[in-house]
Amino acid sequence: MDLLYIKTIVDKRCNLDVSLPVVLGVSGGPDSLFLLEVFVQLGFPVVVAHFNHHLRPEADSEVRTVEQMAKIRKCPFFFGESDVKAEAVSNKRSIEEQARISRYYFLFHAADEVNAQAVAVAHTADDQVETILMHFLRGSGLNGLAGMPFRSEEHGWNSTKPLVRPLLETWREEIEMYCHEKGLTPLRDPSNLDSQYYRNRIRNELIPLLEDFNPKLKEHILNLSQIVQDELAAKKSEILDVWVRVLAHQDESQLVIHTSELRKLELAFQRQVLRKIQMILAPEFRNLDFVTVERMIHNIQIPFSSASQDWIAGIHYFQTRKAVIFYRGNELPLDYESPQIIKKSREWDIGSILSLANGWKLKGEIIS
């Protein structure tokens, strides 16, 4: 195991400062235990954060085990929990998706509590391959084929703290070997063998089958991820320019997009705009597929309808003559194009002109 190479990734790709604290998501399994070892050896002020999903009988005892892992290494320990199964039913999500959402909310809350510079998780090269295959099977675009980045600023969980994944080029087999050589005893999650979970079926059934066709399948998929990430990075400034052109208005409740500007874009950029809208309004949603994107592109081309319609993940939209307005929640936002008074109360002398939002002006006179 080349720890010097991982240090280079932590420094250059994750862009972390060794003098500032980092919250580590630690389940106690081989990957996260290895991540904890690496960060302690590199000299980071480490905060160990463990989340109990209450999905398995042994989950409570695992909390104590991970707490002991932190104590041995003289690291502060944060603990969170929720009834993920009940939340999944209530929110109409899969257990996998709800577990991920609940866990990340907890991790970034812990990062805020200790003023950490980042949250680090132990996704490996194997996890990257599985993620890309999942995206591919769901009909993803280039963003899905890019997989997970080493450092993510726009993850949706926290606007100021990045999510970093230092182990994306480290294979699970290497980690297992390291744990064995160092006498480390990680926890084992039996649910990793349960085929009712989609990722497990990818890992335990699909990948071995595909490796019969090409034994270097995983290495090739990892290379594909890097190629796509580099391509997207090269186009980043161009995509930003497009976003500036189409965005009419943004606040905490809505995104307003210039319909005419959106329609003028090449199809590839229209797709990028829609994926960015989804990332801003529903960052926890990961299954934006080709059909959903194409249907929205088609809807935007037809004459406007003032009726609010559902899109995905609790995002709704309606069209005006000049814009399409995306929002989340049950409350219909104000029509951006209509005259609005921004402040709740405002003095106005009858006879004078009052400037409103969006270039509107209000003028009054007394008629006797």
Model-derived segments and their meaning:
Residues 1-208, 237:
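Core alpha/beta nucleotide-donor-binding catalytic domains of modification enzymes
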Residues 58, 99, 167, 171, ...:
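Catalytic cores of large soluble enzymes that bind and process phosphate-bearing ligands
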Residues 124, 176-219, 223-226, 308, ...:
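Mid-to-C-terminal catalytic subdomains of enzymes
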Residues 2-30, 44-47, 51, 82-84, ...:
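AMP-forming adenylation/ATP pyrophosphatase catalytic core
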